[in-house]
């Protein structure tokens, strides 16, 4: 009985309160409508009043505004503001260090060591001087690496792109952050050498890959100055460029890359290191300039231009670099 009565009393109380509230709301309906109309009127009239009062105040007080502007632009006011700013910066709570250039310079890079690997012929395409030139263009984090290892050689591994992809994949597993330098020699009598630097290991893919750190390069052996002087007629821009001489002012140098002339190994010097090809295709023993005359190699790089992102594109049948 007691539990049942306790359950009935709240329902009766709630019903009574709802009826009383409905009667009260019915009696207060006109007042609510009046307050709503007043709030709507003030909502539309307040912005207009604010704008009109602002314009009136600006038009009726021109002297005060001009005086305030003069005071703000006065030399004394500027000097006080500067003193306050200096005092705030030199306060003991704020420490402003004095920065000067460090007299210490980073140490020079250690010489490169080219490791051809077993079963590779003594005569190779890459010289140490050419490798040092390529090293200056690779990312700074990889310039500290002083040992370059041969991953693939046409003479040792055969003409197979799948073998090239496989060997580069093995190197990427051992060194995930390694870079890759591609060296190619054409079949022309001059034996020009060209190649590229690749940020990623070459592998078959359906899309372009690589970053803006990739670049192309080429190197060629320059003829001796005596041969250049014997050429009759005006010298072309290509001959001037190969000789290491500056181009004429009329030449288009908009897309000119990095060019360097460097001295290669001596002719006929077979020390077992990676060496550059000879310009005449011979061994250099019967060269007219003598066996001790060093070669001059023309190096030119073509960095990322920013036009597109077509860096590397490889498939099972071809390898493309700088497609854009």
Curated annotation (Swiss-Prot):
Biological process terms in GO annotation: response to oxidative stress
Compartment(s) where it occurs, according to its Swiss-Prot or TrEMBL record: Mitochondrion
Entry GO CC: mitochondrion; nucleus
The keyword Kinase is assigned to this record: no
Residue ranges annotated for the TLDc domain, each copy included: 124-324
Ranges annotated as biased composition (Polar residues): 251-263
Keyword tags: Mitochondrion
Biased composition (Low complexity): 9-29
Annotated InterPro entries: TLDc_dom (IPR006571)
Highest rank taxon of the organism: Eukaryota
Region (Disordered): 1-35, 63-113, 244-292
Cytoplasm found in the keyword field: no
Principal place of residence: mitochondrion
Reported function: May be involved in protection from oxidative damage.
Family in the record: Belongs to the OXR1 family.
Record-given protein name: Oxidation resistance protein 1
């Amino acid at each position: 009985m007691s539990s049942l009565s306790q359950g009935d009393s709240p329902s009766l109380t709630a019903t009574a309160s709802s009826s009383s509230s409905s009667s009260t709301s019915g009696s207060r309906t006109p007042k609510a409508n009046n307050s709503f109309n007043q709030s709507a009127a003030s909502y539309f009239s307040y912005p207009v009043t604010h704008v009109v009062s602002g314009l009136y105040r600006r038009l009726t007080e021109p002297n005060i505004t001009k005086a305030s502007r003069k005071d703000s632009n006065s030399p004394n006011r500027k000097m006080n503001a500067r003193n306050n700013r200096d005092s705030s910066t030199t306060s003991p709570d704020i420490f402003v260090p004095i920065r000067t250039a460090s007299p210490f310079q980073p140490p020079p890079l250690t010489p490169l060591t080219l490791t051809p690997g077993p079963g590779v012929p003594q005569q190779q395409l890459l010289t140490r001087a050419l490798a040092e030139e390529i090293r200056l263009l690779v990312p700074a984090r990889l310039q500290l690496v002083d040992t370059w290892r041969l991953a693939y050689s046409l003479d040792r591994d055969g003409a197979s792109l799948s073998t090239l992809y496989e060997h580069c994949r093995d190197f990427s597993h051992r060194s995930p952050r390694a870079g890759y330098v591609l060296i190619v020699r054409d079949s022309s009598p001059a034996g020009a050498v060209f190649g590229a630097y690749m940020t990623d290991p070459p592998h078959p893919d359906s899309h372009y890959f690589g970053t803006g750190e990739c670049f192309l390069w080429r190197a060629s052996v320059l003829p001796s100055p005596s041969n250049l002087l014997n050429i009759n007629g005006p010298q072309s821009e290509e001959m001037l460029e190969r000789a290491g001489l500056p181009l004429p002012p009329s030449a288009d140098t908009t897309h000119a890359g990095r060019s360097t002339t460097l001295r290669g190994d001596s002719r006929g010097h077979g020390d077992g290191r990676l060496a550059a090809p000879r310009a005449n295709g011979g061994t250099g023993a019967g060269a007219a300039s003598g066996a001790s005359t060093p070669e001059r190699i023309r190096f030119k790089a073509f960095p990322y231009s920013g036009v597109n992102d077509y860096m590397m594109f490889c498939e099972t049948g071809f390898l493309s670099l700088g497609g854009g």
